[in-house]
Protein backbone atom coordinates (compact mmCIF):
# COMPACT_ATOMS: atom_id res chain seq x y z
CA UNK A 1 0.00 0.00 0.00
CA UNK A 2 1.35 3.37 -0.94
CA UNK A 3 -1.02 6.05 0.21
CA UNK A 4 -2.46 7.22 3.49
CA UNK A 5 -6.07 6.83 2.36
CA UNK A 6 -5.66 3.15 1.46
CA UNK A 7 -3.76 2.51 4.67
CA UNK A 8 -6.35 4.33 6.79
CA UNK A 9 -9.18 2.35 5.18
CA UNK A 10 -7.51 -0.97 5.97
CA UNK A 11 -6.95 0.00 9.60
CA UNK A 12 -10.43 1.46 10.08
CA UNK A 13 -12.02 -1.71 8.67
CA UNK A 14 -10.24 -3.54 11.47
CA UNK A 15 -11.76 -1.27 14.10
CA UNK A 16 -8.88 1.16 14.59
CA UNK A 17 -9.33 4.90 14.85
CA UNK A 18 -6.92 6.70 12.53
CA UNK A 19 -5.78 10.29 13.03
CA UNK A 20 -3.71 11.87 10.27
CA UNK A 21 -1.27 14.76 10.07
CA UNK A 22 0.17 16.24 6.90
CA UNK A 23 3.44 17.49 8.37
CA UNK A 24 5.79 16.57 11.18
CA UNK A 25 4.77 19.64 13.17
CA UNK A 26 1.10 18.70 12.83
CA UNK A 27 1.94 15.16 13.98
CA UNK A 28 3.63 16.46 17.13
CA UNK A 29 0.72 18.81 17.87
CA UNK A 30 -1.74 15.96 17.35
CA UNK A 31 0.18 13.66 19.69
CA UNK A 32 0.43 16.38 22.34
CA UNK A 33 -3.31 17.06 22.20
CA UNK A 34 -4.37 13.39 22.01
CA UNK A 35 -2.71 11.58 24.93
CA UNK A 36 -4.50 8.27 24.32
CA UNK A 37 -2.80 7.58 20.97
CA UNK A 38 -1.47 4.02 21.23
CA UNK A 39 0.92 3.95 18.25
CA UNK A 40 2.18 6.22 15.47
CA UNK A 41 2.85 5.38 11.85
CA UNK A 42 5.49 7.80 10.59
CA UNK A 43 6.18 8.58 6.96
CA UNK A 44 9.78 9.68 6.51
CA UNK A 45 9.11 11.99 3.56
CA UNK A 46 6.99 14.90 4.84
CA UNK A 47 7.01 18.63 4.16
CA UNK A 48 8.41 21.12 6.69
CA UNK A 49 9.89 18.58 9.05
CA UNK A 50 10.76 15.09 7.84
CA UNK A 51 10.03 11.89 9.73
CA UNK A 52 13.54 11.66 11.19
CA UNK A 53 13.28 15.15 12.72
CA UNK A 54 9.74 14.43 13.88
CA UNK A 55 10.74 11.20 15.63
CA UNK A 56 13.67 12.96 17.35
CA UNK A 57 11.27 15.67 18.57
CA UNK A 58 8.75 13.08 19.79
CA UNK A 59 11.43 11.17 21.71
CA UNK A 60 12.57 14.38 23.45
CA UNK A 61 9.14 14.66 25.11
CA UNK A 62 8.88 12.60 28.27
CA UNK A 63 5.18 11.79 27.80
CA UNK A 64 5.85 10.44 24.27
CA UNK A 65 9.19 8.73 24.83
CA UNK A 66 7.67 5.24 25.03
CA UNK A 67 5.10 5.68 22.23
CA UNK A 68 5.66 2.95 19.62
CA UNK A 69 6.50 4.46 16.22
CA UNK A 70 6.47 2.43 13.02
CA UNK A 71 8.42 4.20 10.28
CA UNK A 72 6.93 3.74 6.82
CA UNK A 73 9.22 4.75 4.00
CA UNK A 74 10.01 4.30 0.36
CA UNK A 75 13.65 4.63 1.42
CA UNK A 76 14.79 1.04 1.33
CA UNK A 77 18.48 1.48 0.71
CA UNK A 78 21.20 0.02 2.90
CA UNK A 79 21.33 1.95 6.14
CA UNK A 80 17.82 3.43 5.93
CA UNK A 81 16.43 1.00 8.51
CA UNK A 82 19.21 1.85 10.95
CA UNK A 83 18.72 5.58 10.36
CA UNK A 84 15.01 5.23 11.19
CA UNK A 85 15.71 3.25 14.36
CA UNK A 86 18.38 5.73 15.46
CA UNK A 87 15.90 8.59 14.94
CA UNK A 88 13.46 6.91 17.34
CA UNK A 89 11.42 4.41 15.33
CA UNK A 90 10.40 1.23 17.11
CA UNK A 91 9.94 -0.60 13.80
CA UNK A 92 10.71 0.01 10.12
CA UNK A 93 8.60 -1.03 7.13
CA UNK A 94 9.49 -0.26 3.52
CA UNK A 95 6.84 0.87 1.03
CA UNK A 96 4.84 -0.41 -0.61
CA UNK A 97 3.58 -1.68 2.74
CA UNK A 98 2.46 -5.28 2.94
CA UNK A 99 -0.85 -5.28 4.86
CA UNK A 100 -0.13 -8.52 6.73
CA UNK A 101 3.31 -7.29 7.73
CA UNK A 102 1.88 -3.99 8.99
CA UNK A 103 -0.89 -5.70 10.96
CA UNK A 104 1.67 -8.06 12.50
CA UNK A 105 3.85 -5.11 13.54
CA UNK A 106 0.83 -3.31 14.99
CA UNK A 107 -0.14 -6.38 17.02
CA UNK A 108 3.42 -6.73 18.30
CA UNK A 109 3.72 -3.13 19.47
CA UNK A 110 0.15 -2.67 20.72
CA UNK A 111 0.33 -5.72 22.97
CA UNK A 112 3.59 -4.92 24.73
Pin down the residues of each PLM region.
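Short, glycine/charged-rich "phosphate-handling" switch motifs in NTP-dependent
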Residues: 90
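Receiver (REC) domain active-site loop signature in two-component systems and cognate sites
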Residues: 46
Amino acid sequence: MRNIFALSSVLERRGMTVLTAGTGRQAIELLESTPDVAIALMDIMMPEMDGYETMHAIRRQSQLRRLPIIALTAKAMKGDREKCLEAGASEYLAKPVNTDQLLSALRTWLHR
